[in-house]
Amino acid sequence: MTDVGQYAADSGLALRAIGAGDLGFLDRLCSDPEALGPFEWPGFGDVRARRRRWEQDGYAGPDSTVLAVVLADGTVAGIASWRTVRRGQPDSGICYEIGLALLPEHRGHGLGTAAHRMLIDYLFKFTVAHRLEALTDAANVAERKALERVGFEREGVLREVAFRHGSWRDAVIYALLRDGP
């Protein structure tokens, strides 16, 4: 448990800044293939890279932010993130690509949908983002359903956009506008 503030919802979940006590959790994301699962884990990486990023800006930077998804008892269940993406003309508005990763023991219980709702609510309340996007592996049916449940609309398929587990993978892009579909 850290001493940083939380953004809570009625779902028993909270979003909060990454704290020093979460560094072991972040290490697991780099060193345990099961932690991120088959759709996200890119292979072994430099475990120290996540610690360096935390030391640099606490994972709350101007172009990307990562928050801990925390259960009511303080257990970190995963991470929620966003990063700025540029679309259209310069100064045409802010667009964030969001992401969510839950540890295997917390998947399949509706936490992903609840965490997506919290992240959407947070971004539309505290940023000027007009558009949110999410990309997911085309085979990640659970994530696709979660995105659709919270109002994202499928916009298309990015063919063979990511190389993972020995093959090129398609991704599906979803979007949600501040004022609805």
Give the predicted meaning of each segment:
Residues Q56-A68:
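A short helix-loop-beta-strand connector motif used in the catalytic cores of GNAT acetyltransferases and
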